[in-house]
Amino acid sequence: CQNTCPANVEIPLYVDSVYHGEYQNAYSIIQRENPLPTICGRICTHICETMCNRRVKVDEPVSIRALKRYACDKIVEAGEEFPVPAVAPANGKRIAVVGSGPSGLSCAYYLCLNGYDVTVYESKKELGGALYYGIPAYRLPKELLARELDVYRKMGIKFVTEKALGKDFTIESLRADGFDAIFLGLGAQLGKIPPMGNSSVSGVMSALEFLREVAAKEAPDITG
């Protein structure tokens, strides 16, 4: 299972921690290779389960993703905070990350762990990119995304919202502000509409556009 996981998370270790009720430890184990444990506990495609030894040798695989979610949910239910990893001493280097989606957040997380001073720029009002604007709340509650982002803030990562590349700042202006390097995690935000008749009429929109409007509480009236 671990070798099949794209992040190579130490699945046997965190499953054992869940078994013993050590939920904080389980979160920390996941967090070493995956900086978004709570989010992935709800939306990852759990391909690790396809190669679970129990599935191969007995009958059904261990519900690995569900156990990840369970560990995170138990921390929340207990009124506890998610564990914050220790970061390396500051190395004096400043990094700008443009985009607060999964790519930008992962980049910011690991840079901060290694002592870099990281600032994340987001063009929209809310942080998370597709995590906030592309995934419905019934799959990924906004409050859980906010809790995960609190870990980043406690690590020392800074966030700047409603500032867009090419409009409010440029690569050159970031360099002039003293950033030593810039990471662009802009996402793939254009939706597709199938080639069919009347697809260009008013009111027809892509699924991504509709989800963004729902998340921003600007969804069109679809009653009828």
Where would I find each of the regions flagged by the language model?
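Short cysteine clusters
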Residues: C1, C5, C40-C44, C48, ...
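Beta1-alpha1 glycine-rich phosphate/pyrophosphate-binding loop at the start
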Residues: N8-H20, Y27-I30, P61-R65, V97-K167, ...
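Ferredoxin-type iron-sulfur electron-transfer modules in oxidoreductases and energy-metabolism complexes
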Residues: N8-R42, V58-V87, V214-K217
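Glycine-rich dinucleotide-binding loop and its adjacent helix/turn
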Residues: A71-P89, R147-K167, G191-G224
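Membrane-interfacial loop-to-helix junctions in multi-pass inner-membrane proteins
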Residues: V84-R94, F169-I171, R175-A176
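Beta1/beta-strand and adjacent pyrophosphate-binding region of the FAD-binding site
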Residues: A90-S103, G224
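Local beta-strand N-terminus motif with an aromatic residue
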Residues: L174, F179-D180, G224
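Short hydrophobic core segments
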Residues: F179-G187
